[in-house]
């Protein structure tokens, strides 16, 4: 018999993990295979079939621009969206995702123009619809490329039927939305200062602006007081001025009001000087001067008192304060333009107007007001316009700068009449022109320059060309923000109410967009470009829009069949006007702001597609979209439907490098998602996304990626071990009440985690989920439960209830963890699921497991918190003993545990603590703890001394490697314990030995 025993390979009698699921992931090779599998089976269609009849959940995709390969920001955005749609699908919803693309606009025009220049072609000589056709083909190419890149990230959506803003149906619906604004009277042609890109020759919306450091010329200029207001105006009627006020103002008649500006080129557009009733002003006399130009001794100047000293220093003069000048006196002054008489112009009076935007923080306390070159200037001018007109002052705002940045004839002395030609503000390359210097030279010539300097400050630039923009008065098409819409509301009030009714994640987004809506001007819709949806209206010479529903329908029908190219085709005007007199109506050839395009996507997707619904449950984009897509969608929908097109808005931050710097090619610190995918796999990138506080700016680089790779390996190895263990799963179940406490504790933890997972997905708090699951898998499973149960799982008999219960729990653990993680790591979880269920279609067609209510057991959990406290002291002592080489494996130890805490002792009374500590035996002692015993400060009343099992006469079992007192009791298997001998007999009876 002994000979027989010696021939047994005990390792073959163990239920060791068996799996082909590799430790090395090989994601770059495996993921494309799974992408193709999902595409071949049309997984998205199967998801829709499986969810038929469920409540719809719609995340509406904010359209990326169809230009170039995706970058890391795209990857972050699409992964977050995919996690949301997948998680809601697996939580029992019909969670749809239709990807979309923004196709119109300047960047694509630029690309085509670059191609033209390379071929020696002139865009202006190309028929507009031929140019538009090339733009369309360019966008279509990049939609295909980006669609493939998004799917390689693991994104599941209806990529066979995406939406695009250049689809004929979309162009028809966008035009239809514009026509709704026109019919309701919200659309108007106006003249306002807009941000204008000279380089791009178009007006820009706030969303198309970024701020960069810029060095500007600064000047202090003198405006001479010409006279006093002859008559005041009260309720539109002339009224006598206070004689005393006039008398007190007489000594101001030979004074100058000094202004300060960072845009000298706007002086020809000056029409007023603004002051503040809240600022203290004084009349000052120059007593000494050092400059070759500027004020001379004896001159009288008016400043804000708080800024007189600073102004004095700038001009290198000495000032003496004569007396206070009241706001009432300032309002009584009429100034002359410093360029009066130049080129026969500037003969108009320059009034003083009160303005809320005036402060004494910088400058002189007076603001040079050029209503054609600034929003605040425009507002101050328009507020004062009724009073000014009653005084006989012309309030028409001139067009002093043209679309190329040149001065016009409305700027005498600087326009085409100037020797050498019109001065220019900015050239075609975005560089400063000669306008500032021309203005400064003329001020010096007229002794109107007080001082000059330079200032580095934040200045608006086009986000596309990266070149500075100017504020320029132009005729444009606008949507009113504050016009009564017939029900007592305005577009602004509707939008503000909609913001209050919307859930924002994070909550700070609500205040951010609210502040923008509260302060924003009317919405400028027009762009002077070719590639886009036209402002498809007809207007008379006064700017009145033709309101004819039959005409509008013809336009929309044509766009539906032919696209918006129909507007630019020969004969379009007569075709659409029908019986209207074409000579009375002008066809508007401007195109729409692309933000109106994307702001209308909810119309031709959510409303028009039967697989979607309006409003969307959620919009998710970067935080810059508070002034972009969230903003334009809100305004468009509130203007036509009275509410927002979304219920929830989720925002994410931007991706920085590991040092918190903005990524840029010039710094060489960019992370290219395609490179990460090729080297490590998309699931690594996805793991990074879901473990970040994504609503803030995130950091990414080599070290961050390596941290995620390490975490992924731990997670993967835990899944691999479960798969190996489940190779021995025969599907048997053990009733909950018959399970050991440790198994019931694990089921309780699954019940707790189920709440964390569901609440986390509902709140879009993915980091909360991943932290909980990874900690659970690494700390509670690998280092606790699995470690403890390896003996029972590997060594116990097939009939062992403990082993059966443990296999059953591992089965539940696998099902829950794989499904919970599937939305975040779809490739790895699909691989794991198909390894366990080779005949399955996809884990993504399943739902999260329903956790039985009786798995929750708080009393048991509380007891085991105490058990684990004791265990922690024991394992701490074992680590010390192992480090001191007293023992090798913990199975060589017999800890002697002295307990002087009644609650802890009661908790472990019926627990096999040797099994919990993975030792061969464990002795509970009472009384005084031995000197030198191991303790932990945070676990009072527990002390441990580690003894060796061999010293207690225990013998090592050749099968389980545990040290016991009953090794050799069974003569059939003399080198194993009684437990292991009984198992071997059972295996032999089953024919497995």
Curated annotation (Swiss-Prot):
Alphabetically sorted, this entry's keywords are: Aminoacyl-tRNA synthetase, ATP-binding, Cytoplasm, Ligase, Nucleotide-binding, Protein biosynthesis
Q: What class of enzyme is it?
A: ligase
Reactions catalysed, as given in the entry: tRNA(Ile) + L-isoleucine + ATP = L-isoleucyl-tRNA(Ile) + AMP + diphosphate
- GO MF terms on file? aminoacyl-tRNA deacylase activity; ATP binding; isoleucine-tRNA ligase activity; tRNA binding
- A Pfam match is Anticodon_1
User: Where does the chain bind ATP?
Assistant: 665
Q: Name one GO cellular component term.
A: cytosol
Which of this chain's residues are annotated to bind L-isoleucyl-5'-AMP?
A: 621
What stretch of residues is annotated with the motif 'KMSKS' region?
Answer: 662-666
Cross-referenced InterPro entries: aa-tRNA-synth_I_CS (IPR001412), aa-tRNA-synth_Ia (IPR002300), Anticodon_Ile_BEm (IPR033708), Ile-tRNA-ligase (IPR002301), Ile-tRNA-ligase_type1 (IPR023585), Ile-tRNA_ligase (IPR050081), M/V/L/I-tRNA-synth_anticd-bd (IPR013155), Rossmann-like_a/b/a_fold (IPR014729)
E.C. code? 6.1.1.5
GO biological-process terms attached to the record: isoleucyl-tRNA aminoacylation
Annotated localization: Cytoplasm
Gene3D superfamilies, per the entry: 1.10.730.20, HUPs, Valyl/Leucyl/Isoleucyl-tRNA synthetase, editing domain
**Span of the annotated motif 'HIGH' region:** 64-74
Tagged with keyword Cell wall biogenesis/degradation? no
Q: Which HAMAP family match?
A: Ile_tRNA_synth_type1 (MF_02002)
PANTHER family in alphabetical order: ISOLEUCINE--TRNA LIGASE, MITOCHONDRIAL (PTHR42765:SF1), SOLEUCYL-TRNA SYNTHETASE (PTHR42765)
- Domain note for this entry? IleRS has two distinct active sites: one for aminoacylation and one for editing. The misactivated valine is translocated from the active site to the editing site, which sterically excludes the correctly activated isoleucine. The single editing site contains two valyl binding pockets, one specific for each substrate (Val-AMP or Val-tRNA(Ile)).
Q: Which family does it belong to?
A: Belongs to the class-I aminoacyl-tRNA synthetase family. IleS type 1 subfamily.
Q: What does this protein do?
A: Catalyzes the attachment of isoleucine to tRNA(Ile). As IleRS can inadvertently accommodate and process structurally similar amino acids such as valine, to avoid such errors it has two additional distinct tRNA(Ile)-dependent editing activities. One activity is designated as 'pretransfer' editing and involves the hydrolysis of activated Val-AMP. The other activity is designated 'posttransfer' editing and involves deacylation of mischarged Val-tRNA(Ile).
Describe the subunit structure.
Answer: Monomer.
What is the protein name for this chain?
A: Isoleucine--tRNA ligase
Q: What is the species of this protein?
A: Mesorhizobium japonicum (strain LMG 29417 / CECT 9101 / MAFF 303099) (Mesorhizobium loti (strain MAFF 303099))
Classification lineage = Bacteria, Pseudomonadati, Pseudomonadota, Alphaproteobacteria, Hyphomicrobiales
């Amino acid at each position: 018999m002994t000979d027989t025993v010696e021939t047994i390979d005990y390792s073959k009698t163990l239920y060791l993990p068996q799996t082909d699921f590799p430790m090395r992931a090989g994601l770059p090779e495996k993921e494309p295979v799974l992408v193709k599998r999902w595409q071949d089976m049309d997984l998205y269609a199967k998801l829709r079939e499986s969810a038929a009849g469920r409540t719809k959940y719609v995340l509406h995709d904010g359209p990326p621009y169809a230009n170039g390969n995706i970058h890391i920001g795209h990857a972050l955005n699409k992964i977050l969206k995919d996690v949301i749609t997948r998680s809601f699908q697996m939580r029992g919803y019909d969670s749809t995702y239709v990807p979309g693309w923004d196709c119109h606009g300047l960047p694509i025009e630029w690309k085509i123009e670059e191609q033209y220049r390379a071929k020696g072609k002139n865009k202006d000589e190309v028929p507009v619809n031929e140019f538009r056709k090339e733009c369309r083909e360019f966008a279509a190419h990049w939609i295909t490329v980006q669609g493939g890149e998004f799917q390689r990230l693991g994104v599941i959506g209806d990529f066979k039927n995406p939406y695009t803003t250049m689809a004929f149906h979309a162009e028809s619906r966008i035009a239809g939305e514009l026509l709704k604004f026109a019919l309701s009277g919200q659309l108007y042609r106006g003249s306002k200062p807009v941000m204008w890109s000279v380089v791009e020759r178009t007006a820009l919306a706030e969303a198309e602006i970024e701020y960069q450091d810029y060095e500007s010329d600064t000047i202090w200029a003198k405006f001479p007081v010409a006279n006093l207001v002859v008559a005041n105006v009260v309720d539109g009627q002339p009224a006598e001025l206070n004689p005393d006020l006039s008398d007190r103002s007489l000594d101001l008649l030979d004074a100058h009001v000094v202004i300060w500006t960072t845009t000298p080129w706007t002086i020809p557009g000056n029409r007023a000087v603004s002051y503040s009733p809240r600022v203290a002003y004084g009349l000052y006399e120059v007593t000494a001067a050092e400059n070759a130009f500027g004020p001379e001794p004896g001159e009288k100047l008016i400043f804000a008192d708080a800024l007189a000293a600073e102004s004095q220093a700038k001009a290198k003069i000495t000032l003496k304060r004569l007396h206070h000048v009241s706001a009432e006196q300032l309002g009584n002054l009429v100034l002359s333009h410093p360029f009066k008489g130049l080129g026969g112009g500037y003969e108009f009076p320059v009034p003083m107007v009160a303005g809320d935007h005036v402060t004494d923080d910088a400058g002189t306390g007076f603001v040079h007001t050029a209503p054609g070159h600034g929003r605040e200037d425009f507002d101050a001018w328009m507020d004062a316009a009724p009073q000014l007109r009653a005084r006989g002052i012309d309030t028409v705002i001139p067009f002093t700068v043209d679309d190329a940045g040149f001065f016009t004839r409305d700027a005498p002395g600087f326009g085409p009449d100037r020797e050498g030609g019109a001065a220019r503000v900015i050239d075609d390359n975005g560089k400063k022109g000669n306008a500032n210097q021309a203005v400064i030279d003329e001020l010096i010539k007229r002794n109107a320059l007080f001082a000059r300097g330079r200032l580095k400050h934040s200045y608006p630039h086009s986000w596309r060309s990266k070149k500075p923009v100017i504020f320029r008065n132009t005729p444009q098409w606008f949507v009113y923000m504050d016009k009564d819409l017939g029900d007592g509301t305005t577009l602004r009030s509707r939008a503000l109410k909609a913001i209050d009714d919307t859930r924002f994640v994070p909550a700070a987004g609500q205040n951010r967009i609210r502040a923008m809506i509260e302060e924003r001007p009317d919405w400028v819709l027009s762009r002077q470009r070719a590639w886009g949806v036209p402002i498809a209206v007809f207007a008379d010479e006064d700017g009145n829009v033709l309101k004819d529903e039959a005409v509008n329908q013809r336009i929309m029908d044509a766009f539906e069949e032919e696209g918006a190219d129909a507007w630019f085709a020969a004969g379009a005007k007569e075709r659409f006007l029908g019986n209207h007199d074409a000579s009375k109506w002008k066809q508007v050839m401007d195109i729409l702001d692309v933000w109106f395009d994307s702001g209308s996507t909810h119309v031709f997707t959510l409303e028009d597609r039967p697989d979607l619904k309006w409003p969307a449950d959620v919009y998710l984009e970067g935080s810059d979209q508070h002034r972009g897509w969230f903003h334009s969608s809100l305004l468009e929908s509130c203007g036509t439907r009275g509410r927002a097109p979304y219920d929830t808005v989720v925002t994410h931050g931007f991706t920085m490098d590991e040092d918190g710097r903005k990524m840029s090619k010039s710094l060489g610190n960019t992370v290219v998602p395609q490179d990460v995918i090729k080297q490590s796999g998309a699931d690594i990138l996805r793991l990074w996304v879901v473990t970040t506080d994504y609503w803030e700016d995130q950091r990414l680089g080599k070290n961050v990626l390596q941290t995620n790779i390490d975490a992924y390996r731990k997670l993967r190895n835990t899944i691999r071990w479960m798969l190996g263990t489940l190779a021995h799963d025969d599907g048997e179940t053990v009733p909950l009440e018959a399970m050991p406490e440790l198994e019931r504790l694990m089921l309780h933890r699954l019940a707790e985690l189920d709440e964390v997972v569901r609440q986390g997905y509902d709140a879009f708090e993915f980091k909360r989920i991943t932290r909980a699951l990874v900690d659970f898998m690494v700390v509670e499973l690998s280092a606790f439960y699995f470690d403890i149960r390896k003996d029972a799982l590997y060594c116990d008999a097939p009939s062992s209830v403990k082993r059966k219960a443990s296999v059953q729990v591992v089965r539940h653990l696998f099902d829950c963890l794989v499904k919970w993680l599937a939305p975040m790591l779809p490739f790895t979880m699909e691989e794991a699921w198909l390894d366990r269920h080779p005949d399955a279609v996809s884990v993504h067609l399943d739902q999260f497991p329903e956790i039985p209510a009786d798995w929750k057991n708080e009393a048991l959990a509380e007891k085991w918190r105490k058990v684990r406290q004791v265990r922690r002291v024991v394992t701490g002592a074992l680590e010390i003993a192992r480090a001191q080489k007293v023992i090798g494996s913990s199975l060589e130890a017999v800890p002697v545990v002295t307990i002087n805490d009644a609650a802890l002792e009661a908790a472990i009374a019926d627990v096999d603590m040797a099994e919990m500590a993975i030792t061969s035996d464990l002795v509970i002692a009472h009384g005084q703890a031995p000197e030198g015993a191991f303790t932990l400060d945070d676990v009072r009343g527990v002390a441990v001394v580690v003894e060796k099992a061999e010293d207690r006469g225990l013998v090592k079992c050749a099968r389980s490697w545990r040290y016991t007192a009953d090794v050799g009791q069974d003569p059939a298997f003399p080198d194993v314990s009684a437990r292991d001998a009984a198992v071997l007999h059972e295996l032999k009876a089953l024919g497995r030995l």
